[in-house]
């Protein structure tokens, strides 16, 4: 194998290993977005350990513990379980890390409505 091919293979291997690692989104993030019940202001406190995502979600109505959280490359997924008017409500999130300071999410509310939002790293 020529030196150029060896160097190219090493660069490709390094690039793939870096892209597979989960991004570190640990810390506080905030988002203001429109929902079926009006504008909402959320704070997300994320902690990443490998590909596992844990944390809390704080809303004007209280806090919820993040469930089923994963970070795989630039993809972020988790569930928010809460109670709305006395009924359990499951909200699933799937997002892409846009930059070190922004995550673009689509959240699905109880399998009914999709809502788009951008979370920004709190400063």
Enumerate the predicted regions with their spans:
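Bacterial N-terminal signal peptides that target proteins for export
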Residues: 1-8
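Central antiparallel beta-sheet cores of small beta-barrel/beta-sandwich binding domains
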Residues: 23-98, 104-123
């Amino acid at each position: 194998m020529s030196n150029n091919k060896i160097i190219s293979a090493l660069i490709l291997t390094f690039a793939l290993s870096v892209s597979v690692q989960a991004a570190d989104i640990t810390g506080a993030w905030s988002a203001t977005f429109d929902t079926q019940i009006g504008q909402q202001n959320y704070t997300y406190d994320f902690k990443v350990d490998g590909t596992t995502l844990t944390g809390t979600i704080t809303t004007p109505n209280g806090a919820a513990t993040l469930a089923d959280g994963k970070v795989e490359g630039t993809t972020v997924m988790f569930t928010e379980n809460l109670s709305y008017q006395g009924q359990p409500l499951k909200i699933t999130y799937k997002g892409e890390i846009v930059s070190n300071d922004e995550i673009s999410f689509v959240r699905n509310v109880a399998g009914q409505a999709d809502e788009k939002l951008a979370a920004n790293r709190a400063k």
